[in-house]
Curated annotation (Swiss-Prot):
DCTP binds at R102, S103, T104, F105, A106, R107, D118, Y160, K166, Q167. One of its GO terms (biological process) is dUTP biosynthetic process. This is dCTP deaminase. The lineage of its organism: Archaea, Thermoproteota, Thermoprotei, Desulfurococcales, Desulfurococcaceae. Catalyzes the deamination of dCTP to dUTP. Pathway: Pyrimidine metabolism; dUMP biosynthesis; dUMP from dCTP (dUTP route): step 1/2. Its EC number is 3.5.4.13. The keyword rRNA processing does not apply. It is an enzyme of class 3 (hydrolase). Belongs to the dCTP deaminase family. Pfam families: DCD. GO terms for molecular function: dCTP deaminase activity; nucleotide binding. It comes from the Archaea. The gene is dcd. Homotrimer.
Length: 176
C-alpha cells in the first residue's frame, strides 16, 4: 500500500520515519520531495582507468566537489554524477521507498536508474544522475527526488544493515 500525505505525517510524528531537515514543502500528496545536498562526485574521464568491481574501490577514479546555492554544478550530456540528498533519512522496518526523479528534472533531460530505499536504512541517499542531451546546471537545496513510500505486508525480518548504512554525503560504490 502506498502511503498518503496523512500516513507520512503520522509516521513522522511518531518518529517511526525520520527526515531531517524537514521543510514545509517536503511532504507531498503521496510521497516526499528530497533536496540536493552540497557534495557531488563525477568519474574522471580517462580511458586508461578500468575499475574492477570485485576488487577496486573507486576513490581514485572519482573527483568530488562541494558547491553552494549560488554556483551549483553542471551535469554534462551522458555524464554520470553521484549526488547526495541534503536530508538524513531513517526508514522504519515496515516501509520501503521508491525513488524517482521529479518530472521537472526529467524534462531537463536528466534521469536516474531505478532506486529503492530499503526498510531499516539510515543515512543520506546517494543517487546517480545521468545527463541527457544538453548540459544542465543544478543547485544544492533544489527539490530533485520524489520518494513514494510503500508499507510491507509485515515488518521485515532482517532490516537493512549493509555497507551503505549510516552513509553521510556522497558514498561511492564499495566492492562486495
Amino acid at each position: 500500500m502506498i502511503l498518503s500525505d496523512w500516513d507520512i505525517r503520522v509516521y513522522l510524528e511518531k518518529k517511526l520515519l525520520v527526515i531531517n531537515p524537514l521543510f514545509p514543502d517536503t511532504i507531498r500528496e503521496n510521497g516526499v520531495d528530497l533536496r540536493f545536498g552540497y557534495q557531488f562526485c563525477r568519474f574522471k574521464k580517462d580511458q586508461n582507468i578500468i575499475v574492477d568491481t570485485a576488487r577496486d574501490p573507486v576513490d581514485k577514479t572519482l573527483v568530488c566537489e562541494e558547491t553552494d546555492e549560488n554556483n551549483g554544478i553542471i551535469i554534462n550530456p551522458l555524464e554520470h554524477v553521484l549526488a547526495t540528498t541534503l536530508e538524513w533519512v531513517e526508514m522504519p522496518n515496515d516501509l520501503i521507498g521508491f525513488v524517482n526523479l521529479r518530472s521537472t528534472f526529467a524534462r531537463y533531460s536528466l534521469y536516474i536508474p531505478p532506486t529503492i530505499i530499503d526498510a531499516g536504512f539510515k543515512g543520506n541517499i546517494t543517487i546517480e544522475l545521468i545527463g541527457g542531451s544538453i548540459p544542465v546546471k543544478v543547485y544544492p537545496k533544489q527539490r530533485f527526488l520524489h520518494v513514494i513510500f510503500a508499507r510491507t505486508s509485515s515488518p521485515v525480518y532482517r532490516p537493512y544493515s549493509g555497507k551503505y548504512q549510516k552513509q553521510r554525503g556522497v558514498t561511492p560504490p564499495k566492492p562486495d
